[in-house]
Design a protein with these regions (language model features):
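Conserved segment of the helicase C-terminal RecA-like domain
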Residues: 153-183
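Conserved interdomain hinge at the start of the Helicase C-terminal
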Residues: 32-85
Length: 207
């Protein structure tokens, strides 16, 4: 439950503690960075969220966990569609008919699908399946409750689990990520921050 002191559940052995890693990314190209520099308000948040480097980093993280089930969370439809196309996986959004959404999640639970990209609809009362890996590719401006829900998707009775939070370096995403992760740390979840170097792959061990 969101209001629960998760550290007590971990100590009692009821759930496996997830590990949360915030990964600060460089811009994927100068075009996106220039667009962000000239954007304002909501558009600025969108451009930071849609940083092309997040596609490459998501691929690297999924490659590092080849046998794990993974949910990739986004707040922007264009970003979700681009990620789903790049990864060749389904994108579940509020625009998807309920019967199709149910089929996707049934396939995910059955192990026929390893990865699903999910829009904010996944945080709004939908019975999402649990996953071994969660990648938060955008949505860093959301509430602390939303951040807690997304981390909670990887809480399992046994086995390891990981949450990766992708934030574009030098933008408001850094502040949002740190704010949400402080909230998770207060609940007993271990949080690790790392910088992904320009052109240097994932920057640290993601195993």
């Amino acid at each position: 439950p969101i209001g629960t002191d998760w550290s007590r559940l971990f100590e009692a052995g009821y759930v496996q503690e997830p590990e949360v890693r915030i990964r600060y990314l460089p811009w994927g190209d100068d075009v996106a960075q220039n667009e962000w520099a000239h954007a304002e308000g909501r558009d600025r948040h969108r451009v930071a969220a849609e940083n092309p480097e997040k596609v490459a980093e998501t691929r690297r993280l999924l490659d590092a966990h080849p046998d794990a089930s993974a949910l990739v969370f986004v707040d922007w439809l264009d970003q979700g569609e681009a990620l789903a196309e790049a990864l060749d996986v389904p994108f579940v959004s509020g625009e998807m008919p309920h019967h199709r959404r149910d089929r996707v999640f049934e396939s995910f639970r059955a192990g026929d699908l390893d990865t699903v990209v999910v829009s904010r609809v996944g945080d709004e009362g939908i019975d999402l399946p649990n996953a071994e890996v969660a990648i938060v590719a955008s949505g860093l401006g959301g509430s602390r409750r939303q951040g807690a829900q997304r981390a909670g998707r990887t809480m399992r009775p046994a086995g390891g689990s990981r949450v990766y939070v992708l934030a574009t370096r030098g933008t408001s995403e850094e502040e949002f990520a740190q704010r949400q992760m402080r909230h998770l740390a207060e609940k007993g979840i271990r949080v690790i921050e790392s910088n992904v170097d320009d052109g240097a792959g994932s920057g640290d061990d993601v195993e």
